[in-house]
């Protein structure tokens, strides 16, 4: 027997993908008042877009929330105390966007290895200048946070002949064909000292906030490149700018930032050794369609009493 419920879609944007819900009983709203008519019955909340404050207000006004789903993989804009302490399961879109972020990470590695900035600058200036570039075959990449995004990175760099290291809270007991060596978080500095490229793909939690700061940059090679495709505040940007300006590291490829949008005048716009993406490395032509299709499959599973995928540990934040 199907589990009856109404899907409450918290959405600030009029994305065309919302029309894919037309086969379900649902309400789309930008204010708590929009959901008042459904708040007394069993509901599923889809956090599609919008501020945490709105999601919290909708959650608190509903009497029978069965499940909450976050469109994105990151949960820092979804978690609030009442949801964390409740028995309501929370799922996310982890895995939906990983492939594109893995591709961006590889592109950033090649950008610095082949010095594409120099090529483009010379082309624009009409300068013919030959110079040496690097091979990434035989170099080492360290992945800080080996979840879906981290695995997507490993899948792309491993065939390029790179040695792949990874930090994971609970390293697997069996061998992983993509990883040469796992490190526990307490050995992060040891791993960083070995890396030519460091890819941060961590969720944002109290434990991961500024996990990469002055001490971590000091442990890196002066030729190291840092890439962030997880959450901006995982990296202490002030410490990173100091390291980049002093050339204590070679460069940084960034898709996420502590403050978004990045304010005009921020030094990262001007640094020659920074590759900057305005948090759109996963914005492919299909990304929102994929996100909605994943939710629809989740809703089918929920309706049929099947286990949900991507159930997160709310106390850990991922």
Identify the function of each model-found stretch.
Residues 90, 223, 229-318:
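Rossmann-like dinucleotide-binding domain for NAD(H)/NADP(H)
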Residues 88, 93-140, 148, 152, ...:
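Phosphate-binding beta-alpha-beta segment of Rossmann-like dinucleotide-binding domains, i.e.
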Residues 57-64, 81-85, 217-222, 243-248, ...:
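Short, conserved loop/helix-junction motifs that constitute active-site signature segments
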Residues 35-40, 59-62, 136, 190-193, ...:
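A short, aliphatic-rich alpha-helical micro-motif
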Residues 1-52, 303:
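N-terminal glycine-/charge-rich "phosphate-binding" loop or analogous flexible N-terminal tail
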Residues 171-267:
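Rossmann-like adenosine-cofactor binding region
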Residues 16-23, 35-40, 58-59, 78-85, ...:
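Short loop/helix-cap segments at secondary-structure boundaries that form the rim of catalytic
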Residues 43-120:
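Phosphate/diphosphate ligand-binding glycine-rich loop within oxidoreductases
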């Amino acid at each position: 027997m199907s589990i009856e419920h109404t899907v409450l879609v918290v959405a600030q944007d009029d994305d065309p993908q919302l029309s894919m819900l037309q086969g379900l009983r649902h309400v789309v709203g930008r204010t708590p008042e929009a959901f008042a008519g459904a708040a007394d019955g069993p509901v599923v909340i889809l956090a599609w877009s919008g501020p945490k404050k709105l999601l919290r207000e909708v959650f608190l006004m509903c009497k029978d929330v069965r499940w909450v789903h976050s469109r994105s993989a990151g949960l820092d804009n979804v978690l609030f105390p009442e949801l964390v302490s409740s028995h309501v399961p929370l799922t996310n879109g982890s895995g939906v966007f990983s492939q594109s972020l893995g591709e961006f990470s590889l592109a950033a590695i090649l950008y610095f290895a082949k010095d594409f900035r120099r090529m483009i600058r010379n082309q624009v200036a009409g300068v013919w200048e030959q110079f040496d570039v690097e091979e990434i075959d035989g170099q080492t990449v360290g992945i800080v946070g080996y979840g879906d995004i981290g695995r997507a990175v490993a899948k792309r760099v491993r065939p390029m002949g790179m040695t792949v290291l990874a930090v994971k809270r609970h390293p697997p007991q069996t061998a992983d064909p993509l990883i040469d060596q796992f490190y526990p978080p307490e050995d992060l500095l040891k791993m960083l000292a070995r890396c030519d490229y460091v890819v941060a793909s961590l969720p944002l939690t109290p434990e991961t906030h500024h996990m990469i700061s002055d001490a971590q940059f000091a442990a890196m090679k002066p030729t190291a490149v840092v890439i962030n495709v997880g959450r901006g505040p995982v990296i202490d940007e002030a410490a990173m700018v100091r390291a980049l300006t002093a050339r204590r590291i070679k460069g940084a490829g960034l898709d996420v930032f502590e403050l978004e949008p990045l304010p005009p005048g921020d030094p990262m716009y001007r640094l020659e050794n920074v590759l900057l993406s305005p948090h759109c490395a996963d914005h492919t032509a299909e990304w929102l369609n994929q996100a909605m299709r994943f939710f629809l499959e989740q809703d089918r599973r929920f309706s049929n009493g099947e286990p949900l995928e991507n159930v997160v540990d709310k106390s850990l934040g991922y």
